[in-house]
Amino acid sequence: MTRRQRRLGILLAALVCAGAATALTLNAFRSNLVFFFSPTQIAAKEAPVAQVFRLGGLVERGSIQRERDGMTIRFIVTDTARGVPVVYHGLLPDLFREGKGVVARGRLGEDGVFVANEVLAKHDENYMPPEAADALRRAVQVNEQMAKESARSASR
């Protein structure tokens, strides 16, 4: 083999390896990608059946039903135009309420019922976790105390 043929062989092998790595990476991203659909899109048959995706909307007022086991909850997610029945087995987030925003992750069954394996309650932009609110309150108090002390020392 000449030097040129060896170089060409190494270049081709590197290209094949790079192509395989790219294909594997793209395949991994595609399998982990979860799409978001509204109830109107689901009613229009735009959402895949038996494939994982996210459903977002509002919890319809008067739709929450708890089963006897205490862990299975049925409710309807609506976008005010259409509604999708959801069944979830597990603990709901503290912010889960009727009329509030929710994002559920799961699969749409053949019967049109969305079987959720995760439910996230959405909150408005004014929400602040209690720990963050306490930390902010303490920081404000420290700043006010420092301002008072510097004002006292400046007046002396």
Swiss-Prot record:
Lipid bilayer topology: Single-pass type II membrane protein
Record's keyword terms, sorted: Cell inner membrane, Cell membrane, Cytochrome c-type biogenesis, Heme, Iron, Membrane, Metal-binding, Signal-anchor, Transmembrane, Transmembrane helix
Residue intervals on the Cytoplasmic side: 1-7
Residues given in the record as heme binding sites: H123, Y127
All ranges on the Periplasmic side of the membrane: 29-156
MF terms in GO: heme binding; metal ion binding
Top-level taxon: Bacteria
Transmembrane segment boundaries: 8-28
GO biological process per UniProt: cytochrome complex assembly
GO terms under cellular component: plasma membrane
InterPro entries linked: CcmE (IPR004329), CcmE-like_sf (IPR036127), NA-bd_OB-fold (IPR012340)
Subcellular location(s) per record: Cell inner membrane
Function comment: Heme chaperone required for the biogenesis of c-type cytochromes. Transiently binds heme delivered by CcmC and transfers the heme to apo-cytochromes in a process facilitated by CcmF and CcmH.
NCBIfam families: PRK13254.1-1 (NF009727), PRK13254.1-3 (NF009729), PRK13254.1-5 (NF009731)
Record family assignment: Belongs to the CcmE/CycJ family.
Name of the protein described by the UniProt record: Cytochrome c-type biogenesis protein CcmE
